[in-house]
């Protein structure tokens, strides 16, 4: 049981708050601002988010290098793990396998 909820249920965190939290915490660790959060999934233990980050800025912008990071957050929205899953140029289009 928690002191904030006498029934012992965990407080609900809104998806928008989790998205901001994932982006902010990853930016603090990497020293680079996120471009976007491209995916957010509720898990048994918390949340998983995919965050897109500009890694190398180039001109023209379509040649800039971005990376996709998978971020794992606990039930309170605190970052517990992150890993880079992909690097790509901004102009690259995803193609079906």
For each of these PLM feature ranges, what is it?
Residues 23-26, 30, 51, 69-73:
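Amphipathic alpha-helical interface segments used for dimerization/assembly
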Residues 8-40:
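Short, non-transmembrane alpha-helical segments in secretory-pathway proteins
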Residues 38-43, 61-63:
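Short secondary-structure boundary/capping segments within folded domains
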Residues 28-29, 54-65, 94:
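Short, cysteine-centered beta-strand-loop-beta hairpins and adjacent loop/turn segments enriched
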Residues 42-47, 74-78:
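A short, structured loop/turn motif at beta-sheet edges
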Residues 62-87:
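A short, surface-exposed beta-strand/turn
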Residues 2-13, 81-97:
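Short, charged, intrinsically disordered terminal tails
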Residues 45-55:
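A short hydrophobic beta-strand element
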């Amino acid at each position: 049981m928690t002191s904030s909820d006498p029934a012992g249920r965990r407080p609900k965190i809104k998806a928008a708050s989790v998205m901001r939290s994932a982006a902010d915490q990853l930016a603090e660790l990497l020293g680079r601002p996120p471009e976007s959060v491209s995916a957010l999934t509720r898990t048994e233990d918390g949340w998983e988010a995919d965050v897109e980050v500009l890694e190398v800025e180039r001109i023209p912008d379509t040649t800039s290098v971005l990376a996709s990071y998978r971020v794992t957050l606990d039930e309170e929205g605190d970052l517990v793990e992150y890993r880079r899953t992909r690097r790509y140029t901004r102009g690259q289009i995803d193609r079906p396998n």
